[in-house]
Amino acid sequence: MESAPPLGGKARSAQGAPVADLAVPLGPMPLHLVVMGVSGCGKTLIGSAVAQVLGLPFIEGDELHPPRNVALMAAGTPLTDADRADWLATIAARLGSAQAAGQGLVVSCSALKRSYRDVLRGSCPGLRLVHLHGSAALLHQRMLARTGHYMPASLLASQLATLEPPAADEDAISVDIGLPPDPVAATVLARLQATAR
């Protein structure tokens, strides 16, 4: 794991390109961050880049789905709340364990509904959220361009229908994905810095 850049140093993305001039750390307490949004929004790409810049571990939430969920999604079957329950509990436990150990953590997780996010916050008070969003056309295009992922583009419509964007009282950072990844990551980092607590 790379260390965070020095105060005022040049932050770099996972690809090594500069993304921000960032003063770190982002506050007195370790950062616990969920990068959320529907499939195709870039949760893994942006989340891993932010984690690398900040010198924090990153967990790909999709890798924590039980095999049954993966099989359902691969077959084009949308997950229900019940299907997601154990998965969300696993992610919540990872966040809670990191917080208890005083270790920051960045996780990618669709977290489509407020009730799902409440589960995560229940195990990790003070959890920060970054909501990546974009047009349905752009999301669909990105899903079609992906290789090696079990989530078919046909499930995008159900995810968009399920999505409950974070409300004002959830204190989420909302970022449009219309720009290339580096500017998106830079925006996330700058807004995390501006709202550090």
Where are these regions (language model features)?
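Extreme N-terminal, non-catalytic leader segments
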Residues: 1-31
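Hydrophobic anchor at the beta1->P-loop junction of P-loop NTPases
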Residues: 35
